[in-house]
């Protein structure tokens, strides 16, 4: 999208109108500057436009697509649990990749289970439940819905922003640790755990915990993750199982 006079309108231009094809959002009375900047960024984000074209519920879908392109954990036949699944973009990707709809002839058919505190609009091929994953018995409920253990537990959750980076970092690390604890209870040996975390220095204990429980732990910032964001994703593969992990001091780290 462009703004102002179009190039080639018949008059010479100073070039100032052509230096930037980004959409500019005028500040409206009553709208905070932060809201204006967020809206401008959304309107100019190629991933936002692509998500609309391709039918995904948000740009975050491309983060899990890019992670799976690299680490190949969403395979046909896999059983996937998406924690904090709203608005549903990660579930949409998982449905397609694990063949949950069974539309890939000759491929195994997977399962996708999404849980969230809030109601989520139905997603073809996914089973969505309203659940607080921190509640007592949530792990057993998830296994009951799946009819067994999961191959993948993934989370794009983030705690509500406090406006203070240090506080937000601590909150999301605690959230990832809680999600990992549920993953330990529901994953099959060899399974994968994927979660978003904000960089900030307090994640060392969480990383050590994952290394004790998984054979490989990687820290990744996919291309779809905004460059000015402190978010990254931890991809932990090769779950050892509850018994094996207790005797392991360190796992293998594939990069920060």
Curated annotation (Swiss-Prot):
Transmembrane regions listed in the UniProt entry: none
Annotated localization: Cytoplasm
Name of a matching Pfam family: FtsJ
EC number: 2.1.1.166
Alphabetical UniProt keywords: Cytoplasm, Methyltransferase, rRNA processing, S-adenosyl-L-methionine, Transferase
Annotated binding of S-adenosyl-L-methionine, by residue: 88, 90, 116, 132, 156
Enzyme class: transferase
Example GO molecular function: rRNA (uridine-2'-O-)-methyltransferase activity
Catalytic activity: uridine(2552) in 23S rRNA + S-adenosyl-L-methionine = 2'-O-methyluridine(2552) in 23S rRNA + S-adenosyl-L-homocysteine + H(+)
GO cellular component: cytoplasm
Family note: Belongs to the class I-like SAM-binding methyltransferase superfamily. RNA methyltransferase RlmE family.
HAMAP family noted in UniProt: RNA_methyltr_E
Protein name: Ribosomal RNA large subunit methyltransferase E
Natural source organism: Paracoccus denitrificans (strain Pd 1222)
Gene this protein is translated from: rlmE
């Amino acid at each position: 999208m462009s703004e102002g006079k179009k190039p080639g309108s018949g008059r010479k231009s100073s070039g100032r109108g052509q230096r930037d094809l980004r959409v500019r959002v005028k500040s409206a009375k009553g709208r905070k500057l932060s809201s204006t900047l967020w809206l401008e960024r959304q309107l100019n984000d190629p991933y936002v436009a692509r998500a609309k074209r391709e039918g995904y519920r948000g740009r975050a879908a491309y983060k899990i697509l890019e992670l799976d392109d690299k680490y190949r954990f969403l395979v046909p036949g896999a059983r996937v649990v998406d924690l904090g699944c709203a608005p549903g973009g990660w579930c949409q990707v998982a449905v397609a990749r694990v063949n949950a709809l069974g539309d890939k002839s000759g491929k195994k058919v997977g399962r996708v289970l999404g849980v969230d505190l809030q109601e989520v609009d139905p997603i073809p091929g996914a089973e969505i439940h309203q659940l607080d994953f921190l509640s007592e018995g949530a792990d057993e409920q998830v296994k009951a819905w799946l009819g067994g253990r999961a191959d993948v537990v993934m989370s794009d959750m983030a705690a509500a922003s406090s406006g203070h980076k240090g506080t937000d970092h601590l909150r999301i690390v605690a959230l990832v640790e809680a999600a990992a604890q549920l993953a330990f209870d529901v994953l099959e040996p060899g399974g994968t755990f994927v979660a978003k975390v904000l960089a900030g220095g307090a994640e060392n204990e969480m990383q050590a915990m994952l290394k004790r429980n998984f054979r490989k732990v990687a820290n990744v910032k996919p291309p779809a993750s905004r460059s000015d964001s402190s978010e990254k994703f931890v991809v932990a593969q090769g779950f050892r199982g509850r018994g094996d992990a207790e005797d392991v001091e360190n796992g293998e780290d594939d990069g920060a």
